[in-house]
Amino acid sequence: MRRFIAWMLVAGALVVTGCSSGPSPHPHFKIGQPYKINGNWYHPEFVTEYEAIGIASWYGSPYHGRLTANGELYDMYALTAAHPTLQLPSVVRVTNLANGRSLVLRVNDRGPFVDDRLIDLSLAAARELGFERQGLARVHVVYLGTARLDEKPIRPGERREYASLSCQLPTPERLVC
């Protein structure tokens, strides 16, 4: 009888853990300390202005559903991006210089850490900007503001804007609108 009860407890525990979901999101503002990856140093900082031209890449299914650097769940079907140094979450405008397509994206992750790439986009963002198949594109990135924690990333086709864009720029001491 004791063995039966023990087996039932083990089976019950397996059923409960088998039904558990992935990581729980806990979004938070993040700047972070300097860090080194693949021999390169990155120095995150709070900015009120940022503009750069460089190479964008995209990342997808291996990271879908995992926690981002600021504690949100990565959704490869949302319009998001990863940047090595901008405060998280941020809002940027990314323009594909080859075709002129432009998107406003939520930056909620760190990366890319390959070669001299400037920004990593979600699969949805790469599709919208027209470089999913090529994998890389030369882009212009402009910082628009700090994103709010209570906003979810926008998906293609949604008709809304980030509320943070109507806010005044926050200070490093107060990262909320």
Please give the residue ranges for each predicted region.
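Secreted/periplasmic proteins
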Residues: 19-177
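Sec-dependent bacterial lipoprotein signal peptides
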Residues: 1-19
